[in-house]
Amino acid sequence: MTQARYVVAALSLVALGVGPALAQGPADNMTFFVTSANPGDGGNLGGLSGADAHCESLAAAVGAGGKTWRAYLSTSTVDARSRIGAGPWYNVGGVMIASSVADLHSVNNKITPETALNEKGASPNYIGGPQPNQHDMLTGSNENGTASAMTCNNWTDGSANSMATLGHGDRLGRTEGVNSWNSVHPSQGCALENLAPTGGAGMFYCFSAD
């Protein structure tokens, strides 16, 4: 086959959807993202099931539904690290965030301002970017992924009467050097207006447990 005929044949296959160019969208292999928005009531996410449903809804909107999406959140009886599967996890751009649960909770994880993207492939308002700063992520977790004492009443309280442990999606902020992605400081409350002053908008991490 001549080069010209080969090119024509290849283009024909792509047009028919046979070639790899149309085989899958960029979100198909995504197994990790930061939520692009809070469901609307701050730390009241409807418990873990409501938070998981929010992850699924956002993922489905960009063609990444059909996976077992889990919010990276701890409660008084559940550790975040135990509910997100075994890994590896990839962001929407195909970058591997971590190869395993142990890797995710080690200094080797690849969560950075450039890789901790939302489901649309956009970077949240991290330090040095657009304002207001929104790098705080709800986790209710310690650095090792176990439950902390602050979980917005197990993610059912969107008021000023409870608090949540927050991580920094950009790994920047409170202390010099690299900050923890999942456990840096407590919130000032669990209402959206309480999350904003320290640099948050009620976003959280979603992982595929498949």
Feature map (PLM): residue ranges:
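Bacterial N-terminal signal peptides that target proteins for export
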Residues: 1-8
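Secreted/extracellular ectodomain signature
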Residues: 22-210
